[in-house]
UniProtKB/Swiss-Prot annotation:
Belongs to the EMC8/EMC9 family. Residues 4-147 form the MPN domain. The keyword Nucleotidyltransferase does not apply. One of its GO terms (biological process) is tail-anchored membrane protein insertion into ER membrane. Disulfide bonds: none annotated. The keyword DNA-binding does not apply. It is found in: Endoplasmic reticulum membrane. It is a peripheral membrane protein. One of its GO terms (molecular function) is membrane insertase activity. This is ER membrane protein complex subunit 8. Keywords: Endoplasmic reticulum, Membrane.
Length: 207
């Protein structure tokens, strides 16, 4: 499997989702730019998947529900309109010391892998979470022989960790998580935009 990297925007929105609902499990999707055919890649191009954005899905009880199907369909359509592809899944469990993927996480990630062969499953480690974001809080899993296995936990999976650390800490300090919209919020009020343009602008402003 190629390497995996997250942009600052993707990492920050994952962190903010967990911060908004600290006593709940949360999950979401990670999107990458749609890949060109392999023959179009320039010689020597690095082989890795770059998650450019994060789409927060649900908080509370995470299950394989009709609403998940609705979310996947809508987000897949949005991705096609913007030359993206659903390429990963993230989840933070309810219990602080539980950072292992459960059946829901593995099933959703496996479904994504059917459409994107290099899909990744990212588990957020709540035990590592601090307001100053001193260390990355993620574990990256890859699918190998139909099983999800944890990749090197010491590897840096952020495109620019110092930037991601600084901006996520700044957004937490300003309580930006209060304005984050996940798909649950969108279902409660369809005017709520799950692409989170305001947070995207805040990240860009801080870069």
């Amino acid at each position: 499997m190629p390497g995996v990297k997250l942009t600052t925007q993707a990492y920050c929105k994952m962190v903010l989702h967990g911060a908004k609902y600290p006593h709940c499990a949360v999950n979401g999707l990670l999107v990458a730019e749609r890949q060109r055919p392999r023959k179009e890649h320039p010689p020597g191009a690095g082989s890795h998947t770059l998650f450019v954005d994060c789409i927060p899905l649900f908080h509370g009880t995470l299950a394989l529900t009709p609403m998940l199907e609705v979310a996947l369909t809508l987000i897949d359509s949005w991705c096609k309109d913007n030359s993206y592809v659903i390429a990963g899944y993230y989840q933070a469990n309810e219990r602080v010391k539980d950072a292992s993927p459960n059946q829901v996480a593995e099933k959703v990630a496996s479904r994504i892998a059917e459409g994107f062969g290099d899909a990744a499953l990212i588990m957020v480690d709540n035990a590592k979470f601090t307001m100053d974001c001193a260390a990355p809080t993620i574990h990256v899993y890859e699918q190998h022989e139909n099983r999800w296995r944890c990749r090197d936990p010491h590897h840096d999976y952020c495109e620019d960790w110092p930037e991601a650390q600084r901006i996520s800490a700044s957004l937490l300090d300003s309580r930006s998580y209060e304005t984050l919209v996940d798909f649950d919020n969108h279902l409660d009020d369809i005017r709520s935009d799950w692409t989170n343009p305001e947070i995207n602008k805040a990240v860009l402003h801080l870069c």
